[in-house]
């Protein structure tokens, strides 16, 4: 089935004939030509845009832009410069203009052609199978309360009901959003686009998602170099972020910020069952599972269930022969990080009690400060924090160190 070309239905006016038209006749001519072109574009999106359509979309007549620099169509430019003459249009031109709508492809012809094209197109969707041109480029008449940039009709997309000020913008929107024919395909995700520029923008997202910063120790990759630098501290043992109150150090600044809240004593998350409060919402969620008895995380080897994912992860290490924490001095490996920490202290030759009295703090100083300051925290600080002092003191008593 042969399609009607734009040249078959276009009406040409000379400059003299165009000057004889009044404002209403020029508007009628513009609307008919643009509507005809949009009908043909709907059938063949790859059709080249004629020079006449370029001129009409910019508010000029059917001549060159240089000749039309001082004239414009109504509703787009100032119409005060138009001639006041009201000569009649030649009858042959009027008859040709009236016949244009008869030569424009009918809705039945468009539907048949569209159905034939969509059968061979990939990704055909049901909502595009019966979409006549009037539905695609439906022009809603303006009301008194409606405003527009071009003081003309509004063009509404039938598929998504978006409204546009001119027909060319509607056509671009349809090609980009609803058109079935999309020749540009992404090699990585097979997503298709009508415009090549859209494909280029989409491909940049794939390049940004590639993790190009890789750790030389464990091979883990990251999006940003700052994330890699923070990760490398876990291998070197460097903890640059230290709490000024308890001297506890952290790898990440976010961990230090979260830790400081524990000193403030703020616990905004309260359990409704037992009224116990927590500083983090995640801890409250773990606690609430104790009341419900919910244990959704089950070990596949021993069928033991846990209430939190981290508990299951720690439990799985006991089943495996993997010892991820290795001592750099003697290459001995351990299941748990706390075991490695306790082992490394043996290489330094420092006992638990010596750790506590590193700053020449004795048990008498500890008890004396408690009596002077009462229940408050002592004013001096330790190298390993108060909790380490209590733990070391108890171990020294059990081992006969005092």
From Swiss-Prot:
Segments of skewed composition (Basic residues): 125-139
Highest taxon above the source species: Eukaryota
Zinc finger (C2H2-type): 155-178, 184-206, 213-235, 241-263, 269-291, 297-319, 325-347
Keyword Transmembrane tagged: no
Disordered: region residues: 118-139
Keywords, in A-Z order: Metal-binding, Nucleus, Repeat, Repressor, Transcription, Transcription regulation, Zinc, Zinc-finger
KRAB domain span: 4-75
PROSITE patterns reported for this sequence: KRAB, ZINC_FINGER_C2H2_1, ZINC_FINGER_C2H2_2
A GO CC annotation given for this chain: nucleoplasm
Compartments where located: Nucleus
Gene Ontology molecular function terms on file: sequence-specific DNA binding; zinc ion binding
Family, per entry: Belongs to the krueppel C2H2-type zinc-finger protein family.
Stated name of the protein: Zinc finger protein 809
Species for this entry: Mus musculus
Gene from which this protein is expressed: Zfp809
